[in-house]
A protein has these predicted regions:
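Pocket-forming structural segment of enzyme catalytic cores
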Residues: 47-52, 57-58, 68-145, 150, ...
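N-terminal beta1-alpha1 cap of cysteine-dependent amidohydrolase-like domains
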Residues: 1-55, 62, 158-180
């Protein structure tokens, strides 16, 4: 587990087997991957709405999609499923989780849904896109909330450990700073 390997204490909860108040004691929250769509993922949507602006969050895959939906985005079911597929993507340099990385990165994709670019919420910024135009990264403009559609823990994402390290180190200071 990358987070533990980087020195952080980790507690894992199933998305339907915890009370929201249990999360008060944690410094940061990772919204992990999983099957299905956010509305079918237990307390995931309630968690985001409860802790937005109160706790830093990183959404991975399903967690990324949930962040999008929680703030008003829609999801699109892809005609082509990506499960264990390595593709390049472009990160725009506007999110500190990508600090120190080149604009073009390789990512491991395991999904069939994406956050739709149509009517994208004003409160979110797109931070990375795949070559086929799918949103691969997003962040909230005012809260310390970041999402990545791809899997940083995958061997297909060579710089995934850097992304997690950057997120763990980011303290929300200079949040609106350009990270290009």
């Amino acid at each position: 587990h990358l987070v533990k390997e980087l020195g952080a204490e980790v507690t894992v909860f199933r998305n339907d087997q915890f009370q929201l108040r249990e999360l008060d004691r944690f410094d940061k929250i990772i919204l992990s991957p999983g099957p299905g769509i956010p509305s079918e993922a237990g307390l995931l949507m309630d968690l985001i709405k409860t802790y937005a602006g109160r706790k830093p969050m990183l959404g991975v895959c399903l967690g990324h999609q949930a962040i999008g939906e929680a703030f008003g985005a829609k999801l699109t079911n892809l005609s082509e499923v990506y499960h264990g597929v390595a593709t390049p993507c472009t990160q725009f340099g506007n999110d500190p989780i990508f600090a120190g990385m080149s604009k073009r990165i390789e990512i491991g994709r395991y999904h069939s849904w994406v956050v739709d670019r149509t009517n994208f919420p004003e409160c979110l910024d797109v931070t990375a896109v795949s070559d086929d135009g799918c949103i691969m990264g997003l962040k909230h403009k005012h809260y310390d909330i970041h999402g990545i559609q791809f899997h940083p823990e995958s061997v297909l994402t060579p710089e995934g450990k850097t992304i997690i390290k950057n997120w763990l180190a980011f303290d929300g200071e200079d949040f609106d700073k350009s990270w290009a």
